[in-house]
Amino acid sequence: MRKPIIAGNWKMNKTPAEAAQLVKDLAPLVADASCDVVVCTPAVNFTAVAEAIKGTNIKLGAQNMHWKESGAYTGELSADMLKACGVEYVVLGHSERRQYFGETDATVNLRTVAAVKAGLTPIVCVGEKKEEREAGYTNALVVYQTLIALTGLTAEQVAKDVVIAYEPVWAIGTGLTATDEQANETIGVIREGIRSVYGDAADEVRIQYGGSMNPKNAKGLMAQPEIDGGLIGGASLKAEDFSKVVGFDK
């Protein structure tokens, strides 16, 4: 049985003081959660959030990392730096990183392998654009993105050390959402793609839905058999909203 995982991606929002207050407000609301709860904050908030979540069931996540251990990479952060700040999860390959900052399937793979090697759990994002879905490329594209990202990992690592997030790009920040059935079907396709290379590891890897999940649609999406959680954007910026997504089964 795969344990659900709900992760909030705060993107470029919240100062350290605001971040600490948000998780303090959130903690009592999700204390009895049946799923893993993660907040992926801007790096400037790591220290404040790590302190605020002590003694709670909330885990700290980052929004990106470099694959090198150190070096002349201005503006980048290494896995060891993240771990030293209390980070346990890291979002990799988000559509906004791909769109605005030149991330490619190849660099997402480098980051994914480096994260696993360092003992971080990557949340690897894959998904299609609107025109790609309309052209019928969705299934081939998401399987390709997933398998490239996982290249170099063992079946055991894929099963236990990686989370996949299916985020249809056309549903990011648009208010549009894949239907429950569309999301479930595509995540099932991703799982079968993983099975084609990694066998039964596909039954253990957790795959989230990441396209405008919110308090209103979380219950229906999470009722789908293939969907193991959500990567939550806007709805993670308010404690009450995020707690309702986390409490999808309440």
Task: Kindly give the residue locations of the regions a language model identified.
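Active-site loop-to-helix "anion-binding N-cap" substructures in soluble metabolic enzymes
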Residues: 1-250
